[in-house]
């Protein structure tokens, strides 16, 4: 969200062992470039530079990132889209609370949906994949009952909500 300060930059400035990373994926529309940036104490950056591979980011990716930084209109459009569809999806998932779903408040381009009912996150993930929706099941992050659902296009966001509703209703 615009104006949302998570305090990460201040933490990196005040602590020598903190690395803040950001991506150009969603807000700048450069997911395919796999490019981002980091901010940290000079000692951390120096250590990273000593071990990184040469040419670890393509020239095209670098040029795209620089151009993206100049595109305030695209960023504003992305923020507005994410805010609108994040709110819509939050309400849709909240409406499935009787099926044991709980949505964690988000200021990002995704929702964390916790499965606390009959259908597990693992089962929902598999069923959504069968319906053509790739979400992220989170056991490796200690959230065996969580799915990360990214805000997509209007069609994708409505589709994943409908698919999840069908899965939960079929389970009873």
What are these regions (language model features)?
Residues 41, 70, 116-117, 152-154:
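Residue-level recognition of strand-loop junctions within catalytic nucleotide-signaling folds
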Residues 17-95, 102-104:
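PLP-dependent aminotransferase class I/II
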Residues 82-83, 87, 96-131, 147, ...:
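Conserved PLP-binding catalytic core of the aspartate aminotransferase-like
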Residues 127-131, 136, 140-172:
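PLP-dependent enzyme catalytic core of the Aspartate aminotransferase-like
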Residues 1-27:
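Active-site pre-lysine segment of PLP-dependent enzymes
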Residues 7-14, 88-96, 127, 131, ...:
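Alpha-helical structural signal in soluble globular domains
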Residues 32, 107, 142-145:
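Short acidic/glycine-enriched loop/turn segments that link adjacent beta-strands
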């Amino acid at each position: 969200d615009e104006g949302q300060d998570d305090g990460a930059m201040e933490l990196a400035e005040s602590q020598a062992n903190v690395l803040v990373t950001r991506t150009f994926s969603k807000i700048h529309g450069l997911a395919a470039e796999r490019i981002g940036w980091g901010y940290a104490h000079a000692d951390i950056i120096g250590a990273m530079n000593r071990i990184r591979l040469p040419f670890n980011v393509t020239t095209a990716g670098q040029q795209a990132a620089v151009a993206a930084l100049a595109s305030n209109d695209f960023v504003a459009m992305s923020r507005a889209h994410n805010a609108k569809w994040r709110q819509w999806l939050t309400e849709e998932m909240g409406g499935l609370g009787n099926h044991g779903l709980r949505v964690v408040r988000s200021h990002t381009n995704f929702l964390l949906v916790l499965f606390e009912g009959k259908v597990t996150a693992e089962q929902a993930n598999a069923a959504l994949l069968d319906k053509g929706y790739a979400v992220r099941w989170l056991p490796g992050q200690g959230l065996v009952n969580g799915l990360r659902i990214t805000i997509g296009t209007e069609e994708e966001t409505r589709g994943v909500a409908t698919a999840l509703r069908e899965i939960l209703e079929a389970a009873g």
